[in-house]
């Protein structure tokens, strides 16, 4: 994000975020296919090949060399964007149910009686993320960062409440539950594909030019920590209860994140944004 012109930064970060999020959707889909057809050794070999290809392609990227910036030997802002902490907390809360989804949704499906089509679920999620690029990047470039994030939050919130309700609906109307389950996949992709790249832009716009890398690092750290917490919490809640309760908890977290975003994050961004 630090090498793009300001006019196109929102769209550029959007494509970066899109690639990141689609990988998180395609990964479980491919993993499930390999698990059903081959051994774990094949899965790990494919992972190694994928990482090697990614490393080779990253090595081809050439960025202009910049003069090092003198800073204090040890300072908090070398590791985290202090102005981005409120947004980081909000993003972390949103990443928790995302982590639950990418890891446990296949087990949740089996628990409620959906035994086939998990590859379709992740495919629809990836398609939704691609669809989000049609409008969200341009909206961010027009300065509507907080509005785009809010749109994504509302959609994701509705999706998690719908996802948690599938267990109950399965007992009442199996066909309706299946439509909702796979519809949730598509709209979760749209919501997260809209929201996460816009969050990246929000972090970058809070940072001076010499801290744009720190801003992106803060964004990624919040996202990764949230996903990790989602793995732990999702497994724990499912162990003491059921997966639908885990997704209901995730839905409640998204409500909390919406309230916190409107009350704290958006006003803080409007006061402190640099571009």
Predicted regions and their residues:
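Juxtamembrane intracellular "pre-TM" segments in multi-pass secondary transporters
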Residues: 63-91
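Cytoplasmic helix-loop-helix junction between adjacent transmembrane helices
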Residues: 1-18
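Helix-to-loop junctions at the C-terminal end of transmembrane segments
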Residues: 132-144
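Intracellular juxtamembrane helix-capping segments at the cytosolic ends
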Residues: 1-3, 194-207
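C-terminal membrane-cytosol helix-exit motif in multi-pass small-molecule transporters
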Residues: 48-67, 260-264
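C-terminal ends and interior cores of transmembrane alpha-helices
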Residues: 155-173
């Amino acid at each position: 994000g630090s090498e793009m012109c300001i006019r196109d930064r929102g769209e550029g970060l959007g494509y970066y975020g899109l690639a990141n999020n689609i990988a998180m959707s395609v990964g479980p889909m491919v993993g499930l296919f390999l698990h059903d057809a081959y051994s774990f050794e094949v899965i790990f070999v494919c992972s190694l090949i994928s990482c090697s290809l990614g490393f080779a392609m990253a090595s081809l990227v050439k960025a202009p060399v910049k003069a090092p910036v003198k800073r204090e030997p040890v300072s908090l802002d070398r590791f985290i964007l202090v102005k981005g902490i409120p947004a980081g907390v909000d993003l972390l809360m949103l990443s928790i149910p995302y982590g639950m989804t990418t890891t446990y949704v296949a087990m949740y499906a089996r628990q409620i009686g959906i035994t086939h089509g998990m590859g379709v679920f992740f495919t629809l999620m990836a398609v939704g993320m691609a669809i989000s690029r049609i409008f969200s990047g341009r909206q961010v470039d027009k300065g509507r960062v907080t509005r785009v994030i809010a749109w994504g939050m509302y959609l994701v919130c509705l999706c998690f409440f719908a996802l948690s309700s599938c267990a109950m609906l399965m007992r009442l109307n199996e066909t309706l539950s299946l439509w909702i389950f796979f519809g949730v996949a598509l709209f979760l992709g749209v919501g997260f594909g809209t929201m996460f790249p816009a969050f990246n832009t929000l972090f970058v716009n809070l940072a001076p030019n010499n801290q744009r890398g720190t801003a992106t690092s803060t964004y990624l750290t919040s996202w990764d920590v949230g996903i990790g917490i989602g793995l732990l919490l999702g497994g724990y809640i499912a162990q003491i209860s059921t997966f639908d309760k885990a997704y209901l908890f995730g839905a409640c977290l998204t409500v909390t994140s919406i309230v916190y975003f409107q009350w704290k994050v958006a006003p803080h961004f409007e006061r402190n944004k640099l571009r």
